[in-house]
């Protein structure tokens, strides 16, 4: 079943995207030289199962709104919202057209309807032209001055190599009335093997091999929807510019602000003054397949001193410890700097530290320092830390405990954190251990280990990376995992998540 070209026969994956967290967006704005967005009136278009929106609403002050026209997905998100008593979240099961009409009626009645953040992750290229125009109307009419739009999408040139395969997948699916990708891949692969050295067929085979083990639901949404819009970045930038006073700010990927090109590439790019043209040429250099764009409406440009002031007084907090392999391939001086940063964040009982405090006495320049900090964030070892209210911290604790109670033993899950304003992942073992920690009277540790051992969804390898097959070797690995959990536990408690 499809709605305006979008697949509705299956619910989308239950995924979390920290890239659309307000504090992460604001840090990207800072690195791009713009003042962060102060208020958090936030709209997500096409929120899927709602994991990101739920997490961000419960973790932040402000008001959060979202719509998705898959009623099953909205019902799932609403159920969690009601159980967790999230007070600042409004969820609609509207199409984009219905949402636009709803907002216009609300405004006509004198209600305040405008947003500081409008985000849409991945859906723009999966809906038809009519819906893309409606999305643009929502942005044009309801984005506040000083607000930002986050929009991510499949793009050219990188996706060009998937176009032929996708076309065959779609035709086979329609003709055989199937969404079974074993059959779709089998047919397409047989065709490509007729002349495997042909460039087109090589691309088809590469597409199949790349997605052979992708999540089945993702494959259906990616390749079988009626609309598969593939713009170049410059096309998207031109589209957004036509909305009026909406300018490209940066790619909303923290590590991209520190992206290094070769000297030849840098020299070539240096001759291009136009921001959009230069960014497009970077996409050609990198063969970009997917973009995460930020556009701003009359944002305030900061001076270098103002940027430094904001950055150096931004606080960061430890989220987890690195493993023995995390910095294995780093240069020695960088390895030392990473370890020193982790040590400083660990000091004073894991109290959040400003960038200025963390950098003090470390003999590296500012750009390298922030690139190291961002790398630690990318590894989910460090998080940005913003002050929050007692009310929000209490809401987060209630939300997280409700997740602990309701999820299956073997599920990895995203928990909310009011200090970071976003989600923190706990793997299935950490979640099981945490549940035991709060309910120790219900089961002793050996009983928990036995329960995990009997669960077919858990698999363990020994120190030689061989599968553990007997009870004793599994219990040995569980003991090691439990020690690791006990080391992380004080961090989780300091984050006031539970």
Features from the language model and the residues they span:
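Conserved SAM-binding strand-loop segment of SAM-dependent methyltransferases
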Residues: 85-98
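Conserved SAM-binding loop
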Residues: 77-78
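A short glycine-rich, Lys/Arg-flanked "PGG" loop and its adjoining helix->strand segment in the class I
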Residues: 133-145
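Conserved alpha-helix/loop element of class I SAM-dependent methyltransferases that forms part
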Residues: 10-40
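Rossmann-like AdoMet/SAM-dependent catalytic core
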Residues: 204-374, 379-446, 450, 455, ...
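Conserved SAM-binding loop of SAM-dependent methyltransferases across substrates and taxa
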Residues: 49-61
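Conserved beta-strand signature within the Rossmann-like core of class I S-adenosyl-L-methionine
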Residues: 146-154
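Conserved SAM-binding motif I beta-strand of class I
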Residues: 63-68
């Amino acid at each position: 079943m499809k709605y305006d070209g979008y697949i509705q026969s299956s619910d989308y994956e239950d995924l979390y995207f920290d890239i659309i967290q307000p504090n992460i967006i604001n840090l990207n704005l800072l690195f791009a030289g713009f003042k962060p967005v102060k208020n958090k009136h936030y709209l997500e278009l096409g929120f899927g199962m709602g994991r990101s929106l739920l997490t961000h609403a419960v973790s932040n002050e402000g008001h959060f709104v979202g719509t998705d026209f898959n009623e099953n997905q909205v019902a799932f998100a609403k159920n969690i919202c009601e159980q967790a008593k999230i007070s600042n979240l409004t969820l609609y099961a509207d199409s984009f057209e219905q949402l636009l009409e709803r907002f216009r009626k609300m405004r006509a009645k004198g209600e305040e309807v405008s947003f500081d953040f409008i985000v849409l992750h991945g859906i723009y290229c999966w809906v038809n032209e009519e819906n893309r125009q409606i999305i643009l109307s929502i942005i044009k009419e309801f984005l506040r001055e000083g607000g930002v739009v986050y929009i991510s999408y499949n793009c050219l040139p990188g996706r060009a190599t998937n176009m032929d395969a996708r076309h065959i997948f779609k035709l086979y699916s329609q003709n055989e009335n199937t969404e079974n990708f074993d059959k779709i891949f089998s047919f397409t692969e047989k065709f490509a093997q007729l002349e495997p050295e042909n460039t087109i067929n090589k691309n088809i085979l590469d597409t199949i091999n790349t997605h052979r083990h992708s999540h089945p639901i993702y494959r259906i949404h990616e390749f079988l929807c009626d609309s598969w819009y593939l713009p170049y970045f410059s096309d998207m930038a031109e589209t957004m510019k036509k909305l009026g006073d909406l300018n490209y700010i940066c790619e909303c990927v923290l590590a991209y602000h520190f992206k290094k090109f070769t000297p030849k590439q840098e020299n070539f790019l240096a001759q291009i003054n136009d921001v959009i043209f230069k960014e497009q040429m970077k996409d050609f250099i990198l063969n970009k397949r997917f973009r995460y764009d930020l556009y701003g409406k009359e944002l305030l440009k900061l001076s270098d001193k103002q940027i430094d002031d904001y950055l150096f007084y931004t606080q960061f907090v430890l989220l987890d410890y690195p493993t023995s392999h995390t910095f294995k391939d780093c240069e020695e001086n960088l390895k030392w700097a990473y370890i020193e940063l982790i040590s400083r964040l660990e000091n004073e009982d894991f109290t959040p530290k400003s960038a200025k405090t963390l950098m003090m006495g470390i003999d590296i320049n500012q750009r390298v320092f922030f690139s190291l900090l961002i790398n630690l964030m990318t590894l989910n070892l460090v998080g940005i830390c913003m002050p929050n209210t007692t009310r929000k911290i209490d809401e987060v604790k209630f939300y997280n405990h409700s997740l602990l109670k309701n999820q299956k033993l073997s599920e990895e899950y995203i928990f909310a954190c009011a200090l970071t304003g976003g989600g923190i992942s706990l793997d299935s073992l950490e979640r099981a251990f945490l549940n035991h920690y709060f309910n120790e009277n219900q089961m002793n540790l050996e009983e928990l280990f036995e329960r995990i051992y009997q669960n077919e969804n858990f698999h363990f390898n020994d120190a030689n990376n061989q599968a553990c097959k007997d009870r004793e070797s599994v219990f040995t690995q569980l003991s090691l995992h439990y020690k690791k959990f006990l080391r992380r536990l004080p961090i989780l408690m300091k984050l006031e998540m539970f």
